[in-house]
């Protein structure tokens, strides 16, 4: 375990192993974004070794440096410079050792394929380790490998673990098997926050295969030899609960407060006010939550799917009353969740069951449990007012975002602003604006979600930009461009228009819509083409996307992430809505919570990666999902005249909104 206050140490980042392979270490987690591959590309280039020799360890809390978690599309931006410098520093030390060993000045030395070379001599890195591993504080000014010598960075590569995943060799949490491992099942209360009044476990304890009925406060579960036995016994536990309504917190955060906004709105030549509504939606991972806990007297080992291995470690240590250093978290491959795995629900429950039974325990949630008990994306009501001058330019903007908390990190205004208020401030050229975030109470459990609040805010802002263009008789593209001064932002918007043939309107019942944004330094613009039937059914036909993530480590990896984000966001826009009553989720299965399937996929998604290579790399795990819903809604209006200010864009809603 590495202390979170330590400076960057080489031994925390890079190891040259005795077999000549290289181990690179990071606290980040790869749940489909391609981080493992990108990090391997960076390290292979800076150390001058074949990429197949680079092994990347992610999230093992006994090995990697402390990390707060993998979220917000920060990973490449944060880790790439650190790994690059560490690998370059390792190469520097190897050259120093070779110079002393060979008696040659360093200007006579070079590296190639995992060895120091000089004339006809070749010294493999492993022969330079002696008894001293590479170590030391990584300097900020270490010399990096020249761009022209990089073999991997900037080139498309398949994910290193892709073959294992598609052939079934990859290890997911449910694949873990430990000696003496039992299975667990939880006894669920009727509602979140309920308190346990009494418990009768007599019948459950007498059932076949039952090892223990475990209670820790208001947490109750059964441990048995087989999962079916554990579930049957859990159903036989007679628990009396006292339901206590739980509501989320409230807060108000001024995010931008320019002077005289209301006065300028009143004086505007054209004024427009609209409200946009987005429902809560489920994380709905293909693989429900699972964890294996092995709790012994001397400590605990956890096998989990998580975005926050150190956060899980800290929570497990607190739950079990152990020092942090006595808990090891070993992250496993997990289904893509983008936020859901920030919570350690299954891990905490498995740890309690393991401690209470004295056995390693595998706990797997059911699909119904996943829908009913996992956190969701909050609902949002977005109120926007803007004024235009006689030339059709924006002169004032007022934006009120009403939503719930998007994180469990507390109510610090700065935290709320970058989570629940993400992308609430429009990315266009500055005009007088007042932007206020209102955190409203809810009985629904809410937390991190892919793009946090950005997808909600951008849906409202980009739909409203189209409506402003409409009331001022301007083309939606031209209207946006007149309000963009950032050169990189302008370029992606212009290029997506060119790539999609924006000026060539599709015929029949088809229409195109545009939406764009800047997400944490990544510039993204999309055009969607849809077909709307007379009955209001929406079919997504094509999507064009131009993205600028700065320096691009793996272009194919970027395309994969953007395509996946578009597909998922299209599902949010067209299909998904979590129904709840007094905090209880009502639709807890695929039959009542539909998501987009293969038949709903568009004919094509064209992603053009046009990164500014002179700029630092930024994230791509979330930006692709941000503008899609607005692009689709704007396309639906272009195709049918139906302006939808809420999602999902169901057949019934679209038909009702169609003119005539």
Descriptions of predicted regions:
Residues 1-660:
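Cofactor-binding beta-sheet edge motifs in enzyme active sites
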């Amino acid at each position: 375990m590495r202390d979170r206050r330590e400076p960057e140490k080489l031994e925390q980042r890079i190891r040259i192993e005795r077999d000549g392979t290289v181990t690179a270490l990071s606290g980040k987690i790869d749940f489909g974004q391609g981080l493992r591959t990108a990090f391997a590309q960076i390290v292979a280039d800076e150390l001058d070794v074949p990429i197949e020799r680079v092994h990347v360890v992610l999230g093992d809390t006994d090995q990697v440096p402390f990390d707060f978690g993998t979220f917000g599309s920060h990973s490449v931006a944060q880790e790439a410079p650190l790994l690059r410098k560490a690998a370059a520093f390792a190469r520097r030390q190897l050259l120093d050792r070779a110079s002393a060993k060979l008696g040659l000045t360093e200007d006579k030395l070079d590296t190639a394929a995992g060895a120091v070379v000089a004339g006809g001599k070749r010294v493999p890195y492993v022969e330079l380790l002696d008894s001293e591993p590479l170590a030391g504080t990584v300097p900020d000014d270490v010399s990096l490998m020249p761009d022209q010598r990089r073999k991997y960075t900037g080139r498309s590569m398949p994910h290193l673990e892709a073959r294992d995943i598609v052939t079934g060799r990859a290890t997911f949490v449910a694949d873990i098997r430990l000696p003496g491992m039992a299975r667990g099942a939880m006894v669920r209360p009727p509602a979140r926050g309920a308190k346990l009044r009494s418990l009768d476990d007599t019948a459950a304890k007498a059932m076949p295969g039952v090892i223990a009925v475990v209670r820790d406060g208001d947490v109750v579960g059964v441990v048995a030899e087989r999962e079916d036995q554990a579930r049957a016994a859990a159903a036989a536990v007679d628990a009396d609960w006292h339901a206590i309504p739980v509501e989320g917190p409230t807060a108000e955060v001024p995010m931008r407060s320019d002077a005289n906004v209301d006065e300028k709105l009143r004086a505007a030549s054209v004024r427009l006010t609209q409200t946009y509504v987005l429902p809560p939606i489920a994380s709905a991972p293909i693989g429900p939550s699972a964890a294996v806990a092995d709790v012994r007297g001397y400590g605990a080992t956890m096998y989990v799917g998580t975005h926050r291995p150190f956060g899980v470690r800290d929570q497990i240590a607190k739950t079990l009353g152990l020092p942090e250093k006595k808990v090891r978290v070993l992250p496993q491959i997990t289904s893509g969740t983008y936020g859901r795995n920030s919570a350690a629900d299954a891990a905490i429950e498995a740890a309690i069951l393991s401690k209470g039974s004295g056995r390693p325990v595998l706990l797997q949630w059911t699909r119904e449990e996943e829908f009913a008990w996992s956190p969701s994306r909050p609902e949002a009501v977005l109120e926007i007012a803007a004024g235009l001058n006689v030339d059709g330019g924006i002169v004032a903007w007022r934006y009120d975002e009403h939503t719930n908390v998007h994180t469990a990190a507390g109510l610090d205004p700065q935290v709320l602003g970058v989570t629940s208020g993400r992308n609430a401030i429009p990315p266009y050229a500055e005009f007088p604006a007042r932007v206020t975030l209102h955190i409203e109470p809810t009985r629904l459990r809410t937390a991190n979600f892919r793009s946090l609040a950005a997808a909600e805010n951008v849906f409202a802002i980009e739909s409203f930009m189209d409506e402003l263009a409409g009331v001022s008789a301007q083309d939606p593209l031209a209207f946006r461009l007149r309000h963009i001064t950032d050169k990189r932002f302008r370029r992606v918007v212009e290029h997506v228009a060119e790539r999609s043939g924006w000026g060539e309107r599709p015929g029949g019942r088809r229409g195109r819509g545009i939406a764009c944004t800047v997400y944490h330094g990544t510039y993204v613009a999309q055009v969607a083409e849809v077909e709307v039937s007379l009955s209001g059914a929406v079919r997504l036909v094509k999507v064009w996307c131009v993205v600028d993530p700065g320096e691009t480590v793996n272009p194919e990896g970027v395309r994969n992430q953007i395509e996946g984000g578009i597909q998922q966001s299209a599902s949010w826009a067209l299909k998904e809505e979590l129904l709840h009553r007094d905090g209880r989720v009502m639709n807890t299965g695929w039959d009542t919570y539909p998501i987009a399937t293969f038949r709903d996929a568009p004919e094509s998604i064209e992603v053009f990666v046009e990164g500014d290579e002179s700029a630092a790399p930024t994230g791509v795990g979330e930006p692709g999902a941000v503008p899609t819903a607005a692009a689709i809604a704007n396309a639906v209006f272009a195709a049918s005249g139906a302006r939808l200010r809420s999602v999902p864009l169901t057949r019934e809603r679209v038909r009702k909104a169609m003119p005539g």
